[in-house]
Amino acid sequence: MQKYWREARSLLALAIPVIIAQIAQTAMGFVDTIMAGSVSATDMAAVAVGTSIWLPTILFGHGLLLALTPVIAQLNGAGKRPSIPHQISQGFWLVAGLSVLIIAVLYNAGHIISMMDNIDPLLADKAIGYLHAIMWGAPGYLCFQVLRGLCEGLSKTTPGMVIGFIGLLINIPVNYIFIYGKFGAPALGGVGCGVATASVYWIMYLLMHSYVARAPSLKDVRRPCTFEAADWATLRRLIAIGMPIALALFFEVTLFAVVALLVSPLGIVAVAGHQVALNFSSLMFVLPMSLGVAATIRVGYRLGQGSTDSARVSARTAIAVGMAMATCTAIFTIVLRKPIALLYNDDVQVLTMATHLMLLAALYQISDSVQVIGSGVLRGYKDTRSIFFITFIAYWLLGLPTGYLLALTNQITPAMGPSGFWIGFIIGLTSAAIMMALRIRWLQRQPKSWILQRAAR
C-alpha cells in the first residue's frame, strides 16, 4: 500500500503545476472575451467565432506534439538522455510543417465563415481579421509546446506553469494596447485580441527557450547550435505516435462545437443553459486532464527503467486518484450547482436549465476522469492508436447519435432538448472509460518483453 501512496504524491507533484498552467491558459481566453465585449457585442461574437475555428486547428498541432512527452520520459527512464536533443530537433521540424498547414487553413478560413447561415457581414470580417492575426502566433505556440514537452518528459512541470501565468499577465496589457489603440497602436477591437495572443505566444516561447538554455539540470539535453537535418525515420515514429492523439483531440473539440450548433435552434434559454453547464464542466475537466499528463510521464519513465510492475502501479494510482477527485467534484457540483449557475446568469429560466444540465454533468465526471487519465496512461505505453479508435467510437458513433435522437427526435422518447445531448455525453464518456480500462488491462497482461519493446519504439 505504501508504494501507492508514494506514487500518488509523485503524480500530484507533477499534476498540480499542470492544473495551474491550464487555468492560466483558460483565463487568457476568458480575458479576450471580456475585453472584446467591452468594445461591442459584435467584437465579442467575432472572437467567439474565430476561436471556434482556431481551437480545433491549433489543438490538432498540439496533439501531434504530445508524442514528445512519452518518448522523452521513456528515454529519461532508460538512461538515454543523450538521445533527447535529437527528438527535440525533430520536434521543431514537425513545427515547421504544422505551422505552414495551420496558417494556410486559417488564412482561408473566410470560406468556412461565409458558409455560416445569416452571419452578419461585419461580424464575419472581424472574425476573419482575428484569425489572420492569431495565425502568426501558431509557430510560437507550437515551439513553446515542443520545449514544454521536453520539460514535462523530464518530470519538470513547473516551468510551464510559471510561464503560463506570465503569459496571462502580459496578455492583459497587450490586449489593452491593441484593442483600444493605445501608445500609437491602431484600435483594432476584437482583432486586437488576435494580435495580442499571437504576440504572447511568441513571448512564452522565448521565455521557455531562455529557461531551457540556462537551467543547469537541462545542460546535457540542450540541442547543439549546429543545424540538424530532418530525420525521416524519427519524424515518422513521432507522427505515428502523435497523429492518433491529434485526431482524437480534434474529434473531441469538434464534437462539442457540433453539439453547440445543434442546440442553437432550440432558443436562447437552451443555448445559455448549455453554455453555463459546459463552461463549468470544462473547468472541472482540468483536474483529471492534468493527472492524465502526469500519468503519461510516470508510466513512460517507469517503462524506460524496464519496470512494467512500477508502470502498472503508476497507472492504477493515477486512475484511483482521479476517481477520488471526480467523486469530490461531482458532490461539489450537485450541492452547489445553483449558486454556481448564479455566477453566470440570474435569469430564472436559464438558471433552471443550467442547474438541470449541471446535475447531468456531475453524473459523468467519474467516467470523464477515467477516460482522460486512461488516455494519458495509454500515451505512456505509446499505445496511441487505440486512443483514436476508442474516442471516435465512443463520441461519434455512440454519444452524438444517441444525444441527437434523445434531444431532437421522438424516436426513443419525446424530444428532450439539451438534456438529450448531455445524456449522450454520459453514454459517450462512460463507453470511452470502459474501453480505455479494458485496453489498459489487456496491455498490462501482455509479456513484459513485448511491452518494453513497444515502449522503446
From Swiss-Prot:
Pfam families xref list: MatE (PF01554)
Signal sequence extent: none
Key words, A-Z: Antiport, Cell inner membrane, Cell membrane, Ion transport, Membrane, Sodium, Sodium transport, Transmembrane, Transmembrane helix, Transport
GO cellular component, one term: plasma membrane
GO biological process: sodium ion transport; xenobiotic transmembrane transport
Transmembrane segments: 11-31, 53-73, 93-113, 127-147, 160-180, 188-208, 239-259, 277-297, 316-336, 357-377, 387-407, 418-438
Molecular function (Gene Ontology), one example: xenobiotic transmembrane transporter activity
Cellular localisation: Cell inner membrane
Membrane topology: Multi-pass membrane protein
Function, as annotated: Multidrug efflux pump that functions probably as a Na(+)/drug antiporter.
NCBIfam families listed in its UniProt record: matE (TIGR00797)
HAMAP family associated with the record: MdtK
Similarity comment text for this entry: Belongs to the multi antimicrobial extrusion (MATE) (TC 2.A.66.1) family. MdtK subfamily.
Protein name listed in UniProt: Multidrug resistance protein MdtK
Originating gene: mdtK
